[in-house]
From Swiss-Prot:
Protein name, entry field: Cucumisin
Species in which this protein is naturally found: Cucumis melo
Subunit structure: Monomer and dimer.
UniProt catalytic activity: Hydrolysis of proteins with broad specificity
Database matches in Pfam families: fn3_6, Inhibitor_I9, Peptidase_S8
Domain of life: Eukaryota
Localization of this protein: Secreted
Principal localisation: secreted
Active site: D140 (charge relay system), H204 (charge relay system), S525 (charge relay system)
Signal peptide: 1-22
Glycosylation sites: N466, N652
Pro-peptide region(s): 23-110, 616-731
GO biological process terms on file: proteolysis
Length: 731
């Protein structure tokens, strides 16, 4: 498949699937914002805008307006954002030097105890000087520099390699902890309520940055909940904040601009708790493009898998060169007790910080608003309940909804009881609230109709032991991978449920202003910075490792998870639950570099011309460079087959020793009935650091279910280098 055909297929699918959304950027003349991606940066980056202008003049002629070029990408790769008609975009796509042209899309945010739960206590050994020279780039909603998590006491000046800058608008100041801050808002006005510059008034970016690299703050809590010492995975590391997300979302144009700067500024790792609603192919995906060029410069991107679960095919974090992170539970769970007037108590879930008080109790079905009946008001949907009849009462709603949904319609209520079959994570709400099991809510309704003056108390949340943890949470997006079905995604799982971290004092908590320094929220947005912090910690001990080597270390040392709790198996949790300390000394790694990804791209339909534009070198797709997906040196093994089809597939891999001493590893296979898995050779001897050995894994058999899991472990008796083998009929 040629690169131009790839463009045309994705151009039209993207255009029609996003026609309605793209109107947000559309002018009256039918022009929309497009990104023209042209691969590696020019040798003379300062000439990029002249080159781009010449291209546009060829297409639009005398009607060309310089202001239509919204942004030029030139520091780390080559491209521009521009307003075009559909016809103009097609013409540019066919021009020499263009890799892809795609509509600008809005991405979305994927929104303590966690580190101890991971076996990563405050007392772990650290290479303090190395950690202090590492810069974590966070692409998010900005940052709140006044948070105690970003105090720079004891920090030396920024490392000499740092080339970034600090925007100082709206009284924003960097320090020796936050050493860089930029903001991007290309091609559209600032939304009402947004603050120009890198200051975070949403909270999301402050929370993720402090989870990855925040300093130690004792007595951190949310109104008494989660009390303890807040800290990031690498508290001595520096932070560079790139604000790409605003009230209207996270634009492709802004994400690419941030990558362009972050790579050139000198960040060492990128944390990106953002993603698209729909999967896209690699070079019509801003995150895939940015992270590819980051890998070229030795920079790993940790990216949230998304919050679209629990169904299959919901993750949009698909690129093999980035680390896709699922969210899992930890052993602390917040619960909110409810006691009704007859003395019965029920355990619900929420983050409820409000004081305990007894209030009258009413069912939403009994107080329908004008124009509604009880069949609608029972669910408390928007404006369906009578505001005059709920004042000062706890309302029972036979549904559940997020912190910002419908609560304006419940203004004046004293509290809300909701219900859901899925209660594996807790939210904050603007009123005393608890989400009950459906049977407990039914018992509450029976009580209401058994007495003249029913009432209830919603107690402040407490914590209980969650013995089943870690389990991938229901909202975490799942694979398989829609772009390349035999590359397993997500890659790994980390804590993403009910995470306490820093928060701007001006940002809302549960939909209302609470003036707190910390907040408890859930999402793959929260698991992503945990993995960022751990990857950075691994890098402090192994500073010369490639992004792929760090990724391999995390994946092959991850703790296996139980498919009984997550029937989607590896498509829920990837290689398993992260194990920070084991990842520092994995023994062996599956390494990969740019040339490996070029071979992979050749196998995905990109031709020599396309890959040369992307890489800026003499890479080529040849008959001997087929780029079989099963030969990409990936730390997991994926195979998609037809149901009941007999298959016989082989995978080629190469392992690199990262231990100084000689060692011998033996292969151990775990496979269910119906699968025959062999490894040749099944014993590998390494002479020491950097020695490489290759092997072939062959899988034969047939499967009856949707997902069948097996595993390969290489062990020398000390290290256990584990890779999942996942066969699926979900094609």
């Amino acid at each position: 498949m040629s690169s131009s055909l790839i463009f045309k297929l994705f151009f039209f699918s993207l255009f029609f699937s996003n026609r309605l959304a793209s109107r947000l950027d559309s002018d009256d003349d039918g022009k929309n914002i497009y990104i023209v991606y042209m691969g590696r940066k020019l040798e003379d980056p300062d000439s990029a805008h002249l080159h781009h202008r010449a291209m546009l003049e060829q297409v639009v002629g005398s009607t060309f307006a310089p202001e239509s070029v919204l942004h030029t990408y030139k520091r780390s790769f080559n491209g521009f954002a521009v307003k075009l008609t559909e016809e103009e975009a097609e013409k540019i796509a066919s021009m020499e030097g263009v890799v892809s042209v795609f509509l600008n899309e809005m991405n979305e945010l994927h929104t303590t105890r966690s580190w101890d739960f991971l076996g990563f206590p405050l007392t772990v050994p650290r290479r303090s000087q190395v950690e202090s020279n590492i810069v974590v780039g966070v692409l998010d909603t900005g940052i709140w520099p006044e948070s105690p998590s970003f105090d720079d006491e004891g920090f030396s000046p920024p490392p000499p390699k740092w080339k970034g800058t600090c925007e100082t608008s709206n009284n924003f100041r960097c320090n020796r902890k936050i050493i860089g801050a930029r903001s991007y808002h290309i091609g559209r006005p600032i939304s009402p309520g947004d603050v120009n510059g890198p200051r975070d008034t949403n909270g999301h970016g402050t929370h993720t940055a402090s989870t990855a690299a925040g300093g130690l703050v004792s007595q951190a809590n949310l109104y008494g909940l989660g009390l303890g010492t807040a800290r990031g995975g690498v508290p001595l590391a520096r932070i560079a904040a790139y604000k790409v997300c605003w009230n209207d979302g996270c634009s492709d144009t802004d994400i690419l601009a941030a990558y362009d700067d972050a790579i050139a500024d000198g960040v060492d790792i990128i944390s990106l708790s953002v993603g698209g609603a729909n999967p896209r192919h690699y070079f019509v995906d801003a995150i895939a493009i940015g992270s590819f060029h980051a890998v070229e410069r030795g920079i790993l991107t940790s990216n949230s898998a998304g919050n679209g679960g629990p169904n299959f095919f919901t993750t949009a974090s698909l690129s093999p060169w980035l680390l896709s992170v699922a969210a899992s539970t930890m052993d602390r769970k917040f619960v909110t007790q409810v006691q009704i007037g007859n003395g019965q108590s029920f355990q619900g879930v929420s983050i409820n910080t409000f004081d305990n008080q007894y209030y009258p109790l009413v069912s939403g079905r009994d107080i329908p608003n004008t124009g509604f009946d009880k069949s609608t008001s029972r669910f408390c949907t928007d404006k369906s309940v009578n505001p005059n009849l709920l004042k000062g009462k706890i309302v029972v709603c036979e549904a559940s909804f997020g912190p910002h949904e419908f609560f304006k319609s419940l203004d004046g209520a004293a509290g809300v009881l909701m219900t859901s079959n899925t209660r594996d994570y807790a939210d904050s709400y603007p009123l005393p609230s608890s989400v009950l099991d459906p049977n407990d809510l039914l018992a509450t309704l029976r009580y209401i109709y058994s007495i003249r003056s029913p009432g209830a108390t919603i107690f402040k949340s407490t914590t209980i032991l969650n013995a089943s943890a870690p389990v991938v949470v229901s909202f975490s997006s799942r694979g398989p991978n829609r772009a390349t079905k035999d590359v397993i995604k997500p890659d790994i799982s980390g804590p993403g449920v009910e995470i306490l971290a820093a928060w701007p004092s001006v940002a809302p908590v549960g939909g209302i202003r609470r003036n707190t320094l910390f907040n408890i929220i859930s999402g793959t947005s929260m698991s992503c910075p945990h993995i960022t912090g751990i990857a950075t910690y691994v890098k402090t001990y192994n500073p010369t490792w490639s992004p792929a080597a760090i990724k391999s270390a995390l994946m092959t040392t991850a703790s296996p998870m139980n498919a009984r709790f997550n029937p989607q198996a590896e498509f829920a949790y990837g290689s398993g639950h992260v194990n920070p300390l084991k990842a520092v000394r994995p023994g062996l790694v599956y390494d990969a570099n740019e040339s490996d990804y070029v071979k992979f791209l050749c196998g995905q339909g990109y031709n020599t011309q396309a890959v040369r534009r992307i890489t800026g070198d003499y890479s080529a797709c040849t008959s001997g460079n087929t780029g079989r997906v099963w030969d990409l040196n990936y730390p997991s093994f994926g195979l998609s087959v037809s149901p009941s089809q007999t298959f016989n597939q082989y995978f080629n891999r190469t392992l690199t020793s990262v231990a100084p001493q000689a060692s011998t590893y033996r292969a151990m296979i775990s496979a269910p009935q119906g699968l025959t898995i062999s490894v040749n050779p099944n014993v590998l001897s390494f002479n020491g650091l950097g020695d490489r050995k290759s092997f072939t894994l062959t899988v034969r058999g047939s499967i009856k279910g949707f997902v069948v899991s097996a595993s390969l472990v290489w062990s020398d008796g000390v290290h256990y280098v584990r890779s999942p083998i996942t066969i699926t009929s979900l094609v």
